[in-house]
Amino acid sequence: TGGFSFYSILGNAKLVHSVDSSSKAIDLTCKNVELNFPGDNRHQAFAEDAFKFLDTMGDQYDLIILDPPAFAKHKKVLNNALQGYRKLNAKAFEKIRPGGILFTFSCSQVVSKENFRLAVFSAAAQSGRNVRILHQLTQPADHPVNIYHPEGEYLKGLVLYVE
């Protein structure tokens, strides 16, 4: 639905780029933006792979929100997922201006909070940027986690200040 894009525009962002590999998701985002902000030209949408987009886009950003689909649904692909998170965040660190804010998320059940943090920290170290955690995010209270099923804590996120 483009929720992050919607709220970025609502928060007076000068320019919002929405990127999703799904053209249907991009179409829905564009319809939502047009419905709520008719004629507003601050939004640009790209039906493209985010990795490719970050490689080719020359812009630098003050704020980046990474909210990819689940990179791993089974433990056998956990290492590939962690490499994907590291790579995606490394590309974001390259594109964010000093003093920028990065919101980064994982909704993969099999990726623990600690493994996600380590993948992001590895990306930060690789980028050579000094990064501070401003806030750690998790799923809301309407998605409770059963103590006998810790994998139910599927959503994790970090809000990072990038120097």
Each language-model region and where it sits:
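Class I SAM-dependent methyltransferase "Motif I" SAM/SAH-binding loop
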Residues: T1-G3, C107
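Conserved SAM-binding loop of SAM-dependent methyltransferases across substrates and taxa
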Residues: G3-K14
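Amphipathic, non-transmembrane alpha-helical secondary structure
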Residues: F6, D55, R86, A90-F93
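Conserved SAM-binding motif I beta-strand of class I
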Residues: L15-D20
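S-adenosyl-L-methionine
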Residues: S22-I65, F71
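Mobile active-site "lid"/loop adjacent to the S-adenosyl-L-methionine
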Residues: Y61-K91
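Helix-to-beta-strand junctions that scaffold the AdoMet/dcAdoMet cofactor pocket
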Residues: I96-P98
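C-terminal catalytic and target-recognition region of SAM-dependent MTase-like enzymes
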Residues: I101-E163
